[in-house]
Amino acid sequence: MAKYDVLIIGSGLSGLFSALLLAKAGKRVCVLEKNQQYGGNLQTFERNNILFDTGVHYIGGLAEKQVLYEYFNKVGIANKLSLERLDMNGYDRICFADTPALMYPHAQGYENFIQQLLLYFPHEKRALKQYADTMQSVCAQFPLYNLKQGDAKYNTETLSIKLLDFLNSITTDERLKAVLLGSNFLYGQGCYKVL
């Protein structure tokens, strides 16, 4: 008889969360981690006596009925978290070396995101609307984001979209493209190093 029903490789947020869900469903779960500490990108690390705080600094989707709230609620931790909502009009602000005092906001909510950036790019309403609409459409196609019952398959056509090609198709404004890519470093890439 097998000692475990499920083997999970990696103890980042996804691995730990999956293990918890499976254990709550009665499965015997083993989580393997190559590092000395659990947590993946949830942790800090040190090199040459320098501390690198790579852990989670903020996350979205935690308002009631949003995707992470639903996940956290399912495992019984949503109401145990001490959370503080970030600035609705600019949880992130993107700035550039040539205009350091000018900060472009990444606002919460699709419509607010558009409205806040229209203050800086009034000529780009169509592009911003198309960007926000496409974000919503893409997220709705990923099973882990929409929480609806049914096929848990990824849309390969959506996966083939290249972000920079998409941005080039909706605008010629290089500063707007840079602003929209401004938080790309959070995903391990430079501003223009995108697929």
Annotate each language-model stretch with its function.
Residues 2-130:
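N-terminal glycine-rich phosphate/pyrophosphate-binding loop and immediately adjacent elements
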Residues 98-194:
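Rossmann-like flavin
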